[in-house]
UniProtKB/Swiss-Prot annotation:
GO BP annotations listed: defense response to bacterium
Residue positions, PTM Valine amide: V66
Organism: Leptodactylus pustulatus
Residue ranges annotated as propeptide in the record: 23-39
Protein name: Ocellatin-PT1
InterPro entries in UniProt: Frog_antimicrobial_propeptide (IPR004275), FSAP (IPR016322)
Key word Cell inner membrane present: no
Location of this chain's protein in the cell: Secreted
Length: 66
């Protein structure tokens, strides 16, 4: 009976350790994804600002001709 208890304890312990390792890796992956999203947002903001400036410049040129 003691052998079964030790075996069960070992299986549960190893299962918890592997779960905690997987959980830690998952958190790291989520953090990496968040960093990528922030970089994408930064790039889109730059493109959006450049587009606004381009449209404003074009509208200024059109207004000068009229």
């Amino acid at each position: 009976m003691a052998f079964l208890k030790k075996s069960l304890f070992l299986v549960l312990f190893l299962g918890l350790v592997s779960l905690s390792i997987c959980d830690e890796e998952k958190r790291q992956d989520e953090d990496d994804d968040d960093d990528d999203d922030e970089e994408k947002r930064g790039v889109f903001d730059i493109i959006k600002d450049a587009g606004k400036q381009l449209v404003a410049h074009a509208m200024g040129k059109i207004a000068e001709k009229v």
